[in-house]
């Protein structure tokens, strides 16, 4: 999930971050600023370690890291139509591609890299960056809203199917075919996301009051959650936990909502033969005679847990991650801070804020500046990659740190027969051809 910080209105301090995103398995955070971009590891609560930082590209508004690999994709306001792919550990550019209009968002997994423009989506094979398909004539999508399953065995893509309603188009990124359309909401879509296996799809409309979860690829509604009733809000991020047990939503308000995916059963169990059980049964029966909108509201589940922010109105993104063996709620905001909360997976309730990190102070924390007394960290990655490097052999036969490809060559397809490259291993890297590309019409279209 990535967010681009909006321009500050008169009287408000300009956002410190231009963009920020968690990687696919929520183990890393990337931020973009006017000076460049930074990558952080999320392996510890107390200490925020900066993995890499670069000032070579100014005014970054999109930065995406592929899992925990050395592949990072960057787009700058200085060249908003150009995508740059880097191997940050080596300090080298892998390739860059230019498109016909401004790039609005980028999504990637171990098989596919998607580039979303306002009226088209480009689907690349991440192994060699070959353009596989261009999805044209999509409804105007000015925010670049789209989602890609991180499960490379299906690589499902979801994007808005209408400008006026909440229709979702579900597309198979491997077979390059449309799977189905889902009538998710009456209003325009604001957020969509897949769970880690690609078996569920969650969505929210611009009203931000109701969040729905659908089965994939069937498109059947599984859950319906109500975020609130009093006011409409702008949902800024929507994300499943890696085990798909929870769904987290943040907005322009001061509250982050966490919903629990209760186990679905085919039939409701019999109520106990007590007065309260009888009344509960009568209550559920009565909902069948209420107007549809009221009946739906009565059957919507409320938040299992919440996180309270000390601000509202700022752009932010949230995620759920396990850090040091405990479930945590993480919120990154455009003011340049990362907030870490404890989540009680059994009882829910209000999450407890346990740490606040500054994302602009090179990995030191605000609350524990005495941590500077710890042993000094290794040299920065900028210094590391400047040293002569030796190629480290991979555990997969035929692969080196470069992915086994020489300059200008691509790994033969048969070398992938044993399975995809383990891109979460920093010693491996997708076998991408070093290239310069332009995508302005010479494409396979749909």
Swiss-Prot record:
Where are WD repeat segments found?
184-224, 230-269, 312-351
Q: What GO molecular function annotation could you give as one example from this UniProt entry?
A: phosphatidylinositol-3,5-bisphosphate binding
Q: A single GO BP annotation from the record?
A: autophagosome assembly
For region Disordered, the annotated ranges are: 386-406
Q: Which InterPro entries match?
A: PROPPIN (IPR048720), WD40/YVTN_repeat-like_dom_sf (IPR015943), WD40_repeat_dom_sf (IPR036322), WD40_rpt (IPR001680)
Q: Which SUPFAM superfamilies match?
A: WD40 repeat-like
Q: How does it sit in the membrane?
A: Peripheral membrane protein
What's a GO cellular component annotated to this UniProt protein?
Answer: trans-Golgi network
Q: Motif L/FRRG motif — list its residue ranges.
A: 225-228
- Keywords on record: Autophagy, Cytoplasm, Cytoplasmic vesicle, Cytoskeleton, Endosome, Golgi apparatus, Lipid-binding, Membrane, Repeat, WD repeat
Positions occupied by motif Nuclear receptor interaction: 131-136
Principal cellular location given in the protein's record: Golgi
Q: Which Pfam families match?
A: PROPPIN (PF21032)
Can you say where in the cell this protein is located? Answer: Golgi apparatus, trans-Golgi network; Endosome; Cytoplasmic vesicle, Clathrin-coated vesicle; Preautophagosomal structure membrane
Could you give the domain comment from the record?
A: The N-terminus might form a beta-propeller domain involved in specific binding to phosphatidylinositol 3,5-bisphosphate (PIP2), leading to the association of the protein to the membrane. Association to the membrane can also occur through binding to phosphatidylinositol 3-monophosphate (PI3P).
Q: Which family does it belong to?
A: Belongs to the WD repeat PROPPIN family.
Q: What binding partners and quaternary form does the record give?
A: Interacts with androgen receptor (AR) and the estrogen receptors ESR1 and ESR2. Interacts with WIPI2. Interacts with WDR45. Interacts with ATG16L1. May interact with NUDC.
General function of this protein: Component of the autophagy machinery that controls the major intracellular degradation process by which cytoplasmic materials are packaged into autophagosomes and delivered to lysosomes for degradation. Plays an important role in starvation- and calcium-mediated autophagy, as well as in mitophagy. Functions downstream of the ULK1 and PI3-kinases that produce phosphatidylinositol 3-phosphate (PtdIns3P) on membranes of the endoplasmic reticulum once activated.
* The protein's name in its UniProt record: WD repeat domain phosphoinositide-interacting protein 1
